[in-house]
From Swiss-Prot:
The gene is miaA. The keyword ATP-binding applies. Its cofactor is Mg(2+). Catalyzes the transfer of a dimethylallyl group onto the adenine at position 37 in tRNAs that read codons beginning with uridine, leading to the formation of N6-(dimethylallyl)adenosine (i(6)A). Residues 38-41, 162-166, 243-248, 276-283 are annotated as: Interaction with substrate tRNA. Substrate binds at residues 15-20. Monomer. This is tRNA dimethylallyltransferase.
Length: 311
């Protein structure tokens, strides 16, 4: 008889839905270790605007995959899958259960379904692309990408050299476009996954939470946090880090494109739009159990019962 696959828990949900609070309570009840699934929490020096767990929360429930990139660096779904699989294996080796918590749905999808077989990076090919960029400019290379792979060309900004370089590198190594290769399915996740999504039943409650959270961020020094990033001089609004909701709007304020009240208003609106996209993803998600943010005890009981009954 084959050995059963190890358990894992996905705790998904829109921003400001109470994922972190529930995850901390779950760690008190179950032998779990937390892995962050959030494309904003990976960045160092971006704590307030991302609502990164604070020292008290991390002391109660340490999170893996926080603060692993500088804001000038990119981080792909493939990078996440590699890192998450390693952390999950380490947690299982310790006799515990991986609890993946966050709202970056693309990361969950990559982890659950696997990724396309993209070629490994080739330093020589990458160096050749860098030389061309220095001679002709990234906009010239972006035009080349649009010709060979219109879908990727439309998705990748000319001022995002890391992603632009990778798309060209993939084509030059494999002879196939990034769009072609990403249609090929990868290896599925070798775990028994219990999937949960937490959100308030009333959308108005979520909107209120988002607005209150943004106000608290401003009070906690969000403007000063973004100003420190702005003054570095090596960051720009086309980087994935600065495109994070809240940061892009505050960046516009610091650049003189709007006043602070307008930046806050835009930030709240952008966060609401993010939550709407996350909920849309989740509504189409298979094998998902919904939890109500307004009934934390029931949510806790639902998850713990599911895990304890699956032995």
């Amino acid at each position: 008889m084959s050995k059963p696959l190890p358990q894992a828990i996905f705790l998904m949900g829109p921003t400001a839905s109470g994922k972190t609070d529930l995850a901390i309570r779950l760690r008190e009840q179950l032998p779990v270790e937390l892995i962050s699934v959030d494309s904003a929490l990976i960045y160092k020096g971006m704590d307030i605007g991302t609502a990164k767990p604070d020292e008290r929360e991390l002391s109660l429930a340490p999170h893996r995959l926080l603060d692993i990139r500088d804001p000038a660096q990119s981080y792909s779904a493939g990078d996440f899958r590699t890192d998450a699989l390693k952390e999950m294996a380490d947690i299982v080796a310790e006799g515990r259960i991986p609890l993946l918590v966050g709202g970056t749905m693309l990361y969950y999808k990559a982890l659950l379904e696997g990724l396309s077989p993209l070629p490994a990076s080739d330093p020589d090919v990458r160096a050749g692309i860098e030389r061309e960029a220095q001679e002709k400019g990234w906009h010239f290379l972006h035009e080349e990408l649009v010709r060979i792979d219109p879908v990727s060309g439309a998705r990748i900004h000319p001022n995002d050299p890391q992603r632009l370089s990778r798309a060209l590198e993939v084509f030059r190594i494999s002879g196939k476009t990034l769009t072609e290769l990403t249609k090929i399915q990868g290896e599925p996740l070798p775990y028994r996954v219990h999937q949960f999504a937490i959100a308030p039943k009333d959308r108005a409650v979520l909107h209120q939470r988002i607005e209150q959270r943004f106000e608290k961020m401003i009070e906690a020094g969000f403007e000063q946090e973004v100003r420190a990033l702005y003054q570095r001089g090596d960051l720009h609004p086309d980087l994935p880090s600065i495109r994070c909701v809240g940061y892009r709007q505050m960046w516009d304020y610091l650049g003189g494109n709007c006043d602070l009240d307008e930046a806050v208003f835009r930030g709240v609106c952008a966060t609401r739009q993010l939550a709407k996209r996350q909920i849309t993803w989740l509504r189409g998600w298979k094998d998902l159990t919904w939890l109500d943010s307004n009934d934390g005890d029931a949510a806790l009981q639902t998850v713990t019962n599911s895990i304890r009954c699956d032995v």
